[in-house]
Structure formats: C-alpha cells, structure tokens
Amino acid sequence: MAGFSDIGVFLGYLEWLKVDFYTSRPRRMQESVLKGIVKRNKNTEFGKKIGLGTVKSVEDFQKNMPFTTYEDYDEYVERMQKGEKNLIIKRKPVRYCSSSGSVGKPKIMPKCGEDLWIMQCMGFSGTTGCAAKWFRKRGVKFPKQVGNVAVVLTGHKLADGKMCNGAGQIPIAYLKPISRFFLTTPNDFMYPVDEASVNTSYFHLRFALQRRDLTYLGAMVITLLTTMFDYFEQNWEMLCDDIEKGTIDPSVKCPEELRRKWEKKLKPMPERAAEIRRECEKGFDTPIVPRIWPKFLWSYGMVGSNLKFYVDKLRKHIGDAPIHNMGYAAAEGYMAIPVELNAMDYVLLPQSVFFEFIPVDNPDCDRPLTIDEIEEGKAYELVVTNRSGLCRYRIEDVVRVTGKYKNTPKVEFLYRNNLAMNIANEKTTTQMVDWAAGETQKELGISFKGYSFCDDHDSDPVRYMLLAEPEGDADRSMLPLIEEKLDHYLCESNEKYFKYRRWGMLGAPKVLFLKKDTYADYREMLKNQGKVLNQIKPVTVINNEERKEFFFSHIDE
C-alpha cells in the first residue's frame, strides 16, 4: 500500500503534466484566465465601478481598465471582514493572506478557493514533483520522504472569523491532518497556540535529530534553515543530552502542559544521541547534515537573488545537496515555479493570474506587454489580475526574463520598486525605515540632519545599521537608547521584521554617528561630479560601493 509520501510524489508528477500543458500554450491560457475573472467579478461593487463588464478581450481590458494599488481595495477588504458580500469578488473568501509592504499593519488580501488551490498544488505537489523528476533524471530513486520544515504555522482570525496567514504558510497549513506522515515536528510545535511561548529552533531540531532516516529539510524562506543550524552549533550538547535521556531541557521555552505531555512520550535514545554527539565533536568545518542524516537528499525554501548570501551559509551545513527554490509567490498569487533544483529562476504560471509587464526601460509605454510579448534579457515591472478581486494590481516587483520553458517565459526576481532593504527576506521599505527613524527621533526628542541605512552581513545574525548625522553635538550616551527605540519601531512598522527578530534571524540594529556636515559634503561631491542638485534624492539606503566608501569614511569616531 502506498504511503502518503508516495502519493505526494504521484501528485507531483501529475502537477507537472499540467504545468507542461499550460506552459505550452501561455497566450490561450491567459485569455481563458482573464475571461473567467471578468465573468466572475464583473457584477461586484468594484467591478461595476471600473466597468469590468464591458471587457470583451485582452485589448479591451488593457485599454479601459485602470491600474490599481492596495489603497483601491483597503476599504473593501475592511467591509468584507465585517460581513459584506460581493464587493471585489462574487464568492465569499475562503481565507485571507497577509502581505508585507505597508507601515503599521500588513496588507490583507482575500483569497478565493481557486487561488488557494493553485497555491496548494504548486507549493506542495509542484515542489515534490520537481524534486522527484530531478533525481529520476540522474538515476536516483526518490525514497519515502520524511523531513523537517523549519517554520511555525500560526495565523490569526479576522473579524469575519476567517483565518489570515502569510502566503507561504498556506500549502503546509492545509496538510495539518496528515503532516505527521512526512514531517518530523509534531503538530503541537508546528501549529502552536502561542508561537512566542515555544522555542521553535529547539523543537524542530529535537524531533528531526531523532530520525536517522530524514531525507529533506525545508522552510518557507531559506534563512529559517540557516538560523536553525546556527542554534544547533551553539546547543548541540544540550540537544544530545535530551535525546539520550528522553527529556526537554528546563531552559527551553515551552508551555508547561506541552512539556509534561511530551516528556511522557519521549523515550531515551542513547545510541542515536551518541552517534550525533560523535559527529558534532568532530566540528562543523565539513557539512554536518550528511554525517548525521545519511539518507538526506535535498532542501527547499524561497531563495531569491537577494538571499544568495544565505545559500552559502546553508551549504556549510548541507554540502552540495540540491536546493529547490520553491517558487515566486506572494499574497497576490502563486506566480512562478522553478523547473529544476538549484535554479534561481522560475517559469511563469499562465493558469495562475493574468500577467502584464511594464518595461523598466520604457515605463510610459502605450500599454504593458502580455506574456507572449516579453523578451529575454529585459526587465519588467509586474502587474497582476487574479481571481480574488485584484485588477491590474501593481505589486511593484521587477523581474528579468531569463529564457523559456516550453513556450512560457522564465523570470528571475530582481527587486521591488519601493524596496529599501531585504537582508532577511522581510521586505523593509523606505517608507518603513523613514517612519521608524522619525518615530525614534520624536519619542527621544532628538533630531538628525540626515540618516542612511545599510545592511550588515558581518554581524551574526545579520542586522541593519543606521548612520545618522545629529543636529548639534553628538551625545554618545544616547546610542543604546536610540538603538532600542529604532528596533521597537522597525518591529512595529513591519510584521515580518518583528517575527524575524523574535526568531533570531535578524539582530538588533546598530547606530553610528556621522561627522558634522557629512550630508553637505556628500551633496558637494555629487555636484562636483556634474549632478543636478535638485535631482539628488535623500540617501535613505547605502546600496552601492561609492556610497558605502563615502559614508563609512565619515563615521564620527
């Protein structure tokens, strides 16, 4: 009898048959998707407002429908949560997705059943099928899959009783009833009632280490895996002791009722503990994962071009095992999926959303291009229309076309138009950092002539640095308080920043004072280079070597 893992692989192969079918006829699929969206949502309040019912073709749609941003939907989403119907989608939303990118609160996107089904199929079956195909090509039998997914699947209910989660959590969230068949972490710790009360790194490792037959390691974002292994390097002795004795160390954060429950269930495993301890005592200069999990095959997690730094960190632990880059997904939709392991690009999914592309080198073009018109090597801002009510929605992501799979373009994510920093894939925008810096100054009664943020990859964990030129004399005694308040307001401004700080993926920010007249000197430098002064924007982000060299040479020691 086939196990759940075998069924998952079979479903993965079926999903890739569908992907091959859709990507062979992208224009026809896109026309079909748009036709269905118009038919379904034309009589909603928003659909009537923009005249969606007049659309008869792609050309009509592009000519007559306006571009939109989240501000066009915010009021409708709030009304939906109060029970109103037929506002932007005809059917009731099944649940909501939260998206980063706004100050103070995340964007909330309603999701209909069809969109959720695509997320489920691509996020779970598509990933498994891709891995199975990759190994089959290389003559490697894909064994029964059991592994660790380093994520905590919590959500929150909104006013209408519907759940709200991050988009990346949804595929695993729906598999809760059967997750014990392919995940090492029990549901008590995968789906905790109070996430803050559980040391997730400990429990993911605690249960994964017990299983010598582990075959994969996963996470929604690859940084969660590197954080987990940082914890392992620092705490392997405690973990080995607990596995040996069948205990949970008293220092580990865990609700008492769960501690009592699992200490009754856990059995001493002295032989397994000795095996892990023996390998850890050899050090971590060579990859530890294949030494403690001999059947380990692959990893998965969203990587993206901005997270290549973390791929190198993960390779220290997993060696040259392949990594599946999961997909290009957001609250707006599951837009693309890699066709191979170790790929940094993705094939667009023409059955998922209706795509439009604004050329970066011609943003004022007469009309955006469609999926069959974009060219390899060129960069485009992405515009999407989905089944869940978004119409010509500018998500502000910029992608570059890298090639084709079947007849459909493959793309790589380049950057987000409004993105300031993204050191841990938490999407911290200029709007967020400006707000956090402003609130910090306001609360402490201080003032900066100018300030700039930059990434600090040399810190462990990584963190942001604020370089600020004070008004008047610098009071160094204020630095610890400025750092504390800045951290507080960055957490308030960005839900993901807050979570990643709590999970240990981001360190507290560091603040450095700049010398007097630093920003005046910078403007003078640009003037001498022939720049027009009234076109020089504030340097909110130090994002190139020239800026880095200039500002770090002006640190007030």
Predicted regions located by residue number:
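Conserved nucleotide-state-sensing and coupling region of NTP-binding domains
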Residues: 144-160
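Long, hydrophobic, well-ordered secondary-structure blocks that form the structural core
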Residues: 110, 115-122, 323, 331
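Short acidic, glycine/Ser/Thr-rich loop/turn "cap" segments at secondary-structure junctions
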Residues: 81-85, 104-113, 186-189, 210-213
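Short secondary-structure capping/junction motifs at helix and strand boundaries
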Residues: 47, 107-110, 132-148, 238-242, ...
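Active-site glycine/GP-rich loop and adjacent strand/helix microenvironment
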Residues: 1-53, 61-65, 76, 157, ...
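Conserved adenylation A10 loop of the ANL superfamily
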Residues: 96-110, 228, 511
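Active-site diphosphate/adenylate-binding microenvironment
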Residues: 32-96, 108, 118, 126-140, ...
